[in-house]
Amino acid sequence: MSIANPPHSAAGSVNLDPTIPAPMANATNVAEYGFEGRFVDWADDARYFEYSKAANPIGSGHAPQVPIRQFGPDIYTDQPTGIVPLDLSRELGINNGEATSPALLASFVRIRAGEQIDTAVNATSQLYYVLYGRGFAAVDGRLVKFEKGDFLTLPAGARSVFYADAETAMYWVHDAPLLRYLGAEAREPRFRATKFARADAVAKLEDIANRPGANDKSRVSVLLANENQEQSLTITHVLWAMFGVLPAAQEQRPHRHQSVALDLILDAPPSGCYTLLGTRLDERGEIVDPIRVDWQAGGAFTTPPGMWHAHYNETDTPAHLIPIQDAGLQTYLRSLDIKFTQRRDLVVG
């Protein structure tokens, strides 16, 4: 068995100049290594781009951007037992399954009283919020009750069936689209199944909202977290969830982040609560040429990554919302890049 000596420069070191080919060597005899057959070149799928043609496929429009889309409660109200996916896969250029964002799928789950539904999915993280109703879930042989206002999170490998004692609707978000993109199967749980009871979440939110200066903050909210997420401080290692209130006659100033938000609106008045979204701020920190999304109680909408967004309540009634994001993953990757208008290092525009 012979091994060719590595090429050396005049100084005696290995020559790493890629424009100089390797010196000719004797053909490799694969039989000496215990193999049969011939080499393949694996070049059929190789492509080469000049840098400026492929450095920013999102900005150039080659990769579709996440759209702003709104979903009303009519798509699940008075429907039979079933899952109603908020599917934007066609707009996102995703052809291997349903998706609301590149990494997440949000759905409304409707369960008629006395009926049940299986929600097993290949995902590392699942989050359920109970819009209304009550019942119990059987998860890997264990039973847990749920009712209006509860949050439930399930880890990888969970087998779940939900049973409704009353007419029930839930908002369900999971990361199956991310797993499909990676070609992976979720097997190892990264957290334990967890329930965030309505009474506990509401009590914490009311405590925060009643503190002096609460309305001076960017958001009046509770961030739900799991004790296993010591670095990201999020509800799972992939998902992030906020339970917030938009007080009467208040504005919550613009901020932005690189995670996609799948926003669920709870008890908003019929009109007067809305979100403004845009890509730039003016010198006063206001969104330039904003797109307006009027809130619908029981509805949802998407907030694309990187867009400034601010919430407004022009009524005398508070409104509640639950944004859910892939910010757990983004935080782990150190790519969340959240910015607030009051930050001194903010560069407008």
Question: Locations of the language-model features?
Answer:
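A short beta-strand-loop-beta hairpin characteristic of the jelly-roll/cupin
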Residues: 112, 116-148, 265-297
